[in-house]
Amino acid sequence: MKQPKNVDIPSERTVYRVMEEIGISHHPRRKPNGITKADREARKSEDLLKRDFHAEEPLTKCVTDMTEIKGCDGKLYVSAIFDCFDSSVIGLAMDTNMKASLCKETLENAAKAYPSIRGVIIHSDRGSQYTSQLYREAIQKYGIQQSMNSAGGRCHDNARCESMWARMKTELLYDRYDTEKMTTDELKTIIWRYFTSYWNIRRICSTNRGLPPMIKRQQYYASLKEAA
């Protein structure tokens, strides 16, 4: 799909200004706080990205992380894999626990949606979920290159993921829902819809020059066909 002709896509700054005028806040109210804990005894993988989150092609560099949201019946843990090429979510899973099985499920969902995922670099923090045998076996099964934050667990090493979680919570949750009055099943529904129906398909992204992730991806593959 190509960008419609004669349609001006507003800049992110313009969108934020209009949001301010109509009373919709876009400012995050909470600082991102990592929830995964490192297993000091576990084997770590090398930092292959070294804070370089730029990708010229889809499925070359991805980042993954988890975040938590409090509901009335407990916490919901959201795990996602973002493609650095266009900021799209290529894998998503949610559960009421933050075990390694949740990260494995996220990886499996990405592999189902994108069978060509083999060879991609997926970067994470050094949380025990990502150093677990269960997750490493899934990484090997799909031929993925595992990358992790450098020693010391510096938050900036996975800043791309932290930024995306902050945007999701700001746009979807803050000032719109009282999540602590919602069940985890209700939270699952709105978060799933947000990423699959809005984030990937309709949300403008400044790093994509104002294009939604899937539009940028489609234009990339269309350009390859034209060049062939």
Predicted segments, located by residue:
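RNase H-like two-metal-ion nuclease catalytic core shared by retroviral integrases
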Residues: 35-38, 124-126, 132-136, 148-170, ...
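An active-site-proximal beta-strand-loop segment
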Residues: 51-90, 96
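Short small-residue beta-strand/loop micro-motif enriched in glycine and branched aliphatics
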Residues: 86-92, 146-149, 174-176
